[in-house]
Curated annotation (Swiss-Prot):
Pfam families linked to this entry: HTH_18
Residue stretches of biased makeup (Basic and acidic residues): 42-55
Keyword check for Glycosyltransferase: no
UniProt-recorded name of the protein: Uncharacterized HTH-type transcriptional regulator in cgkA 5'region
InterPro entries linked to this entry: Homeodomain-like_sf, HTH_AraC, HTH_AraC-typ_CS, Tscrpt_reg_AraC-type_HTH
Species for this entry: Pseudoalteromonas carrageenovora
Limits of the HTH araC/xylS-type domain: 67-163
Disordered as annotated region, ranges: 28-55
Record GO terms (molecular function): DNA-binding transcription factor activity; sequence-specific DNA binding
Amino acid sequence: DHIIPLQIKNSQDSQIISFFKADKGSVSRQVHPPWPVPCKSKLQEQDSSESKESKAEQVKINNCVVQNAMLYIENNYFNDINIDTVAFSVGVSRSYLVKQFKLATNKTINNRIIEVRIEQAKKVLLKKSVTETAYEVGFNNSNYFATVFKKRTNYTPKQFKRTFSS
């Protein structure tokens, strides 16, 4: 497999880099690079000689970490991701990310990963089988997917499909 940059855009305010994994001449799922997307904050622009930061500025940094983590989850839910891969992708330690994520969202990272997968599954399930949906949204086991789906939506995947398919 080779990683091929497809789009690179730089500006003062943003940096977008898209990568795709190429497998035998075909382009497959998007793979996001394992480094944080730069967040613009006043603190990052301050002179590094300043020794103290206000609480509000510290929160901006932490929110930036959480924003990057959420972005990574939303863009990679279909992959085999966990707390460690999310922490690595945003460039912080596991324990730091867990603490900041919980403070900012009042949710765990695993809870957010499952939440995103279930929301995507609701869309996919209307067009594909339960097993195909499970694997497409990042579950490695269709029975576990069905259990989690039922717990989160109060519908089994088949009930959901019957109820909401047009």
